[in-house]
């Protein structure tokens, strides 16, 4: 079954991820499984993954999808803006976002949730879609809860 055919609720997705991260102590393994669950469960997306803070930039972490940009400066693009502003960025049309970084020209909308612990940005969760205005309030809330689950694990 392909990702667009799945009809999982946000509660189903959260439950699946919660079970995975509760059983694993390695953050890379947890991020890899979270990216896989989201990529398979969320319809109409073309990329799901993480960028991790390394010095003053975000570096590509575990993901599902096409080849991605490997380094993103803080404050640049949707991911860098989420890290700089320390808040979720939900962009309906990435082509109208100032400084958008087109890692995949097929992407039309994007949502990025920062990973923040004790006031420190550790990285971001990034989800892209080829559909304009793909992400809504319900998915934003769910993705923010996914990040909270990850941060409560042994991250």
Predicted regions and their residues:
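Short loop/turn motifs at secondary-structure junctions and domain boundaries
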Residues: 42, 103-107
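Well-ordered alpha/beta subsegment
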Residues: 135-142, 152-153
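Regulatory sensory and allosteric helical modules in signal-transduction proteins
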Residues: 53-103
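Intrinsically disordered, low-complexity terminal regulatory regions
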Residues: 1-62, 66, 145, 149-154
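A short, aliphatic-rich beta-strand micro-motif
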Residues: 109-116
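Sensory-domain boundary capping and coupling elements
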Residues: 116-129
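A generic structural motif
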Residues: 131-133
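Short hydrophobic/aromatic beta-strand element in the GNAT-like acyltransferase core
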Residues: 47, 112, 124
């Amino acid at each position: 079954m392909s990702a667009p055919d799945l009809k999982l609720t946000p509660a189903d997705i959260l439950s699946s991820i919660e079970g995975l991260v509760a059983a694993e102590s390695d953050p890379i393994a947890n991020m890899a499984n979270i990216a896989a669950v989201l990529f398979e469960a969320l319809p109409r997306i073309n990329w799901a993954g993480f960028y991790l803070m390394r010095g003053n930039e975000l570096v590509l972490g575990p993901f599902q999808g096409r080849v991605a940009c490997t380094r993103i400066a803080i404050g640049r693009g949707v991911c860098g803006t989420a890290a700089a502003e320390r808040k979720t960025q939900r962009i309906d049309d990435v082509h109208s976002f100032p400084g958008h970084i087109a890692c995949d020209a097929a992407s039309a909308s994007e949502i990025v949730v920062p990973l923040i612990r004790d006031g420190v940005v550790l990285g971001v969760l990034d989800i892209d879609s080829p559909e304009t205005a793909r992400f809504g309030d319900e998915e934003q809330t769910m993705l923010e809860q996914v990040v909270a689950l990850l941060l409560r694990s042994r991250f």
